[in-house]
Amino acid sequence: MSPKRLDRVAPPPVQVEWDVRFGTSEAAKGWDDLCAHAAGATRRAFELMRSDPRPPEDGTHYRLRGALASREFAGRILEQWQIKVSGAGRIWYLPDDDKHAVWVVYASPAHPKQTE
């Protein structure tokens, strides 16, 4: 997705921050829905991914378990983390140490079917 006229301007990362990018087209579509559903919580999740994508785990932010704990992305296996943004809203992302980036691979106000 190339930015166009009237699109949001993404803030450039500073050296200590991680670059947050979409890893799938579905995540890019779901991001706007999630922002409309829970703007404040989605912003807090964005800031957390950007500043500390592997914080101490708690009830709303943790690495996924089992078969979902890792995901292949761009030919490499990366850890897969989840942030609970709302009752059902979720963000799944992959911290990429080599690129100092976070790849958002799922974002939606709906609960992911893979975890049901």
Positions of predicted regions on the chain:
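Basic, Lys/Arg-enriched alpha-helical interface segments
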Residues: 1-89, 95-116
